[in-house]
Amino acid sequence: MAAKEVKFGREARERLLRGVDILANAVKVTLGPKGRNVVIDKSFGAPRITKDGVSVAKEIELEDKFENMGAQMLREVASKTNDIAGDGTTTATVLGQAIVQEGVKAVAAGMNPMDLKRGIDAAVEEVVGNLFKKAKKIQTSAEIAQVGTISANGAAEIGKMIADAMEKVGNEGVITVEEAKTAETELEVVEGMQFDRGYLSPYFVTNADKMVADLDDPYILIHEKKLSNLQSLLPVLEAVVQSGKPLLIIAEDVEGEALATLVVNKLRGGLKIAAVKAPGFGDRRKAMLEDIAILTSGQVISEDVGIKLENVTLDMLGRAKKVNISKENTTIIDGAGKKAEINARVNQIKVQIEETTSDYDREKLQERLAKLAGGVAVIRVGGATEVEVKEKKDRVDDALNATRAAVEEGIVAGGGTALLRAANALAIKGSNPDQEAGINIVRRALQAPARQIATNAGEEAAIIVGKVLENNADTFGYNTATGQFGDLIALGIVDPVKVVRSALQNAASIASLLITTEAMVAEVPKKDTPMPPMPGGGMGGMGGMDF
């Protein structure tokens, strides 16, 4: 076991604080509409330029083990806030640094760290309650666009695009952000349920120009196993032919004789048909087939539930207004499923999302939820260079997450103003002087984001904060982008409550841990031993030779 170095008390906290300051000072320059860029060196390719706090925090690793512990603890604040709210990472870092700095000073002055922590926790709880009280619910598409614009560092076109996407796919719909191949940023919306399986044979195509198969008002057969011969399927095929409707077969696979027979029937014009493979694999495939069945009011034909192919009747098949099949994707539009059954399935998936511990499973469940609930929107981010596209994509991701958070818990005045007001309204008292000091630490720290936003814009922070606090209106604040004072909610300068709340709670949680630290243990760095020199002299038995 390697030897360890141990630091105690004041020295330990000072080393932690040094690490916290290094990370926070690099991250906080990105805060606000006039936040500065941070350039990050990459081991290959061009350096990355970003204004995204969590991206900067993730890149920082310090040589000194003890300082690095402080930096990593503060990085955890940014990451946790990003996981919960998807934005607010820089605000969380600024708050964390402010609480740690004040807390370490208080402990050095002889105060009880545990009482300080109790005071900090009580103050944070009070502030969060105040934020919820002041929150304004989001109703209109214009308000959604405002939130998106603020989080995208003032890019109005990004805010509008996110608002359009949410309007089209609903708040539950999936909105993904991808890098575009062109210089333009564009929005593409896929309505209905789409899965990544195309037609099994190009002979199923109905539109040769676009190479797609369009089926209007089709029946949909959902089968769990492979189809290799059509004998057992003949009764239902005949019933479909007599109905005069097209048929879509979704099965694990359709192969050999079965596929050949379907193609021949399609080419002869006797049956308008298409076949696709079932989406997903294993248990996920079963769940997705069940989703399709509920969406189209059909049944999954499976021997597990005792249904054999030869016994299938028309009323067991799903229905939809339209199905569009390309080489790679199948889209079912306007399925005939009952609203109540679809909602029950949506709620069931929501419960699974909350219970799962795997990020991969959560992502897949959210995709399923979106496909059932409304559709999928894709924002393709374009730019002149790869560096620009990556920087813009960071901002779009932030804006999207902030917008979702705003729809969930409402909005408050932005620009750090809500926290300034909450600090003024903080009226609780501690049960002893040390707890009172903890409450005052939070009261002072709540000014830090507003001060930092002003500093980044080249303003005098103390003057700006003073002017804001002279006016008692809750939503009165400073618009850094235009340099004017006014009603921030009316001006569209807003922050989602979830983002502000998560930033404060996570910052206080980690800061309290750092303040109450009394010892630190790290490995002693290994000294590199130099390589021994090569032994001198020639090789034996080589005497008499000149070199």
Swiss-Prot record:
Location, primary (coarse class): cytoplasm
Entry EC no(s): 5.6.1.7
Catalytic activity: ATP + H2O + a folded polypeptide = ADP + phosphate + an unfolded polypeptide
GO annotation terms (biological process): protein refolding
GO molecular function, one term: isomerase activity
Name of the top EC class for this enzyme: isomerase
Any GO CC annotation of this UniProt entry: cytoplasm
Role this protein plays: Together with its co-chaperonin GroES, plays an essential role in assisting protein folding. The GroEL-GroES system forms a nano-cage that allows encapsulation of the non-native substrate proteins and provides a physical environment optimized to promote and accelerate protein folding.
Protein family: Belongs to the chaperonin (HSP60) family.
Subunit architecture: Forms a cylinder of 14 subunits composed of two heptameric rings stacked back-to-back. Interacts with the co-chaperonin GroES.
Protein name: Chaperonin GroEL
